[in-house]
Amino acid sequence: MEDRALKSLNHFSIFRFTEEYWRLESADRRDVHRSWFAGLQEVAGLGTVHRYQLFPTEPLADLMLWCAVEADSNEAPAKFFEGFAKATVPHRRYVEPRISLWGLTRRSQYSKSRSRQEVDPFGEKRAPYLIIYPFTKTADWYLMNQETRQGMMNEHIRIGKRYESIKQLLLYSFGLQDQEFVVVYETDDLAVFSQLVNDLRMTEARRFTLGDTPVHTAVYHTPEEALSIWC
């Protein structure tokens, strides 16, 4: 992971295309996409904007956007949110926002060094699948001492290392959204990822999970691939 990824804002937004969008001719739908994404990329600047397909993994949403920008100043989040809104508002007749999940990166208190399994949000290459969900611990978790929590997290980390091909990004959203974290995984094999989650269900730390739904499973697409699906 690059150093700039250690302090970044990652914003995941889920959209549904409206009936008015589907009434457009194919060429006009392409124009909507190109205009909208050009505006979003301008907002992201040196950051990234990635496109993901949701339907048919879930029935009420079509598209997920992942925007990653550096959060190197107090003004950076406000600048991004303002720019995202300005880029999206002209197209609201065609796209309906459904869900937004976002948070900030920081160093983990349970790991002394960076893991090779950390997702680099600014990396050019993306895995075929992305899984994302909100996550909240119980109050009892935070009332335990650091040593006890560290022991349970060590078990969690050991299991994760068995699945070297799966990468994770943990976003902190305490006091910013309803959840405490946003958990993001990248994988090229959904069956292997499902087995990882199954194994993690049997850890002691699982007792202290308050919420980890809804889960969104998305498929990555390049800009041209996205046009071939939605246009």
Please state what every model-predicted region is:
Residues 56-57, 89-92, 122-124:
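Short, charge-rich binding segments
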Residues 1-44, 70-78, 96-162, 174, ...:
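Short S/T/G/P-rich N-terminal loop/turn motif that feeds into the first structured element of a domain
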Residues 185:
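Small/polar loops that bind or transfer phosphate-bearing groups
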Residues 16, 52-54, 68:
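Acidic/polar N-terminal loop/beta-strand segments that form early-domain functional surfaces
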Residues 39-62, 93-107, 157-182, 196, ...:
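Short, glycine- and small/hydrophobic-rich beta-strand elements in well-ordered beta-sheets
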Residues 84-94, 200-209:
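A common structural junction motif
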